């Protein structure tokens, strides 16, 4: 059975101590266990906010056909603001990347050394100063991210003999949720529009926001406000397996 996962850093286990607990790594193992089949998996970090996302998707799909495709919808393209994105727009991508590499080195020697103390406070102060003096921008506009997601959903809907599962985006957690609260109305509209596109084309939609709200302490299920913890990953896999058990020919015994 051929499985395509159009995932992200979260599906690959970013932030987890054990990346095998990430939903994108758990899913193939569970599919193999439940179906008794060998799972040939293509697992990508795929972001719809990039300029080449549509052409890249065509190259990936050309390696099919796939029995199952799972596409993770993300809003980070327009919700996550950064100084390096603004510098990149003003002075060019190369300068933006150079600035980002410098910030990463600074973070390595300050913020990432520990959770408490003056070092972390100095890191936060430096980032705040940069945000206030230089400004921030998203990776792409809301309109661009939305249109690309609609085009991707439409393209996946044209696949024949393929079970397509669309994973809806989740709101960010913890401190990050406060930082991006101004974009919340856009996120809710974005989620509703992409969901409507998926359901109109008879694709399976899994509401990850609703899954997150089932936890007693939602913020505790994130490792950093953006990436999810092990229990959340497990819940995503259970939801995917649940819909596939009802609808996938591969799992219901009528595989081609």
Regions found by a protein language model. Name each.
Residues 1-47, 51-65, 69-70, 228-229:
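Serine-esterase "nucleophile elbow" of acetyl-processing enzymes
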